[in-house]
């Protein structure tokens, strides 16, 4: 399936609109996220590997904020446990439609994959079934901060003993010098991947009001407040990280 290069912010815009996951973003999203998030392919593939350690027979696995289903595809590649099913959820109609296309293509290429259901829904209003694994891959940062604990508490209540939440997020840092350094290194990463200064600046203006990162300390405190017993960072590249939270 063809993928377009990300040129959404390549031309000067008189007014930069807030970032939304619309059809324009969907067309370039695979290229955008690979060139913008250091370590993204490693995170996605290893979520599948980690899932194989926590998924339990005859349970549901959730990919919340599934976007185009990269994590869902990784779960289906790596989890070989009887009776598991993946539910991929996103609130963007354009994302859901393209995600379904990608998963149909995966079905055509491979046999004996986990069954999957793709749902267009607000994850804050989703009725979660008992589950052995939930993934939030760069999703929580788009949830209103005042509702993040509520969502994590509901996930914790749905998790079965021995299950896990895998949470990946962009981080901010309490130490100003550390935050500035890692922000500069992230900009260098984007430059190295072909983004111009104009593209970087306009994308920042578009996303800074809708994506609100937390610090690692905030994530840990919130997860513990939601009822998780242990929080283990398993990956970090620059200001992007992934955690495993255990019930």
Swiss-Prot record:
Its EC number is 2.1.3.-. S-adenosyl-L-methionine binds at residues 40, 65-67, 90-91, 122-123, 137, 204. This is Carboxy-S-adenosyl-L-methionine synthase. HAMAP family: Cx_SAM_synthase. Keywords: S-adenosyl-L-methionine, Transferase. One of its GO terms (molecular function) is S-adenosyl-L-methionine binding. GO terms for biological process: tRNA wobble uridine modification. InterPro entries: CmoA, Methyltransf_25, SAM-dependent_MTases_sf. It catalyses: prephenate + S-adenosyl-L-methionine = carboxy-S-adenosyl-L-methionine + 3-phenylpyruvate + H2O. Homodimer. Catalyzes the conversion of S-adenosyl-L-methionine (SAM) to carboxy-S-adenosyl-L-methionine (Cx-SAM). Belongs to the class I-like SAM-binding methyltransferase superfamily. Cx-SAM synthase family. The keyword S-adenosyl-L-methionine applies. It comes from Ectopseudomonas mendocina (strain ymp).
